[in-house]
Amino acid sequence: MLRILLSNDDGITAPGIQTLAAALREFAQVQIVAPDRNRSGSSNALTLDSALRITTLSNGDIAVQQGTPTDCVYLGVNALMRPRPDIVVSGINAGPNLGDDVIYSGTVAAAMEGRHLGFPALAVSLNGQQHYATAAAVTCRILRALQHKPLRTGKILNINIPDLPLSEIKGIRVTRCGSRHPAEQVFCQQDPRGQDLYWIGPPGEKFDVAEDTDFAAVEQGYVSITPLQVDLTAYGAQDVVENWLASMAD
């Protein structure tokens, strides 16, 4: 039976992870190791300055107290799930992780940690907060396909699903990340003692929404699958930097 380590960044009680766990348990052994609270936007943060405590729920799910998604996958793989998983799955996130959003996403980071530790990994996000059953069904279909024929790319699959009934999903597209304009908004308030409080504003407006992007696919009713990689090296820029350094020596 397929062994799945399941995590997220919305917290262990979030409807996305619970809906997905129920669907996956129809054909796989699932161990949830997830934050005890919402840790959205935590990216790849790893807790190094304090100890981590866990709470094991009556059904065997494990909540990591004040843990990040990366903490959860690290602990799940290296300490809490035995035997180790066959694959790491993160989600279902309440809201999309498209374009530049993947930089900040705890959902994507959990999958990234799984891949970094040597396991196949999926990040799953719903473009809304209604049709979690659709996202769960799509995820199960993809996992069954991977079980039948493993995808040997060494990449993370970042999956974004339109917030639609399953019957209205048009298909699946392999995409690249689109991009947004830089975010600029900060909201400032004052507390009753006159101290300034700052709230980070919404993401920037979409910029690159070409037909081959994740933005376009989801907007048009398609599931978007974008392969992502742990290696952030910009290989195409190496010669440019070499030439720049050489010119400095002249």
Swiss-Prot record:
Chief localisation class: cytoplasm
Cofactor(s) needed by this chain: a divalent metal cation
UniProt: a divalent metal cation binding residues: D9, D10, S40, N93
Record text on cofactor binding: Binds 1 divalent metal cation per subunit.
Stated name of the protein: 5'/3'-nucleotidase SurE
Highest taxon of source: Bacteria
Catalytic activity: a ribonucleoside 5'-phosphate + H2O = a ribonucleoside + phosphate; a ribonucleoside 3'-phosphate + H2O = a ribonucleoside + phosphate; [phosphate](n) + H2O = [phosphate](n-1) + phosphate + H(+)
Gene: surE
Gene3D superfamilies in the record: Survival protein SurE-like phosphatase/nucleotidase (3.40.1210.10)
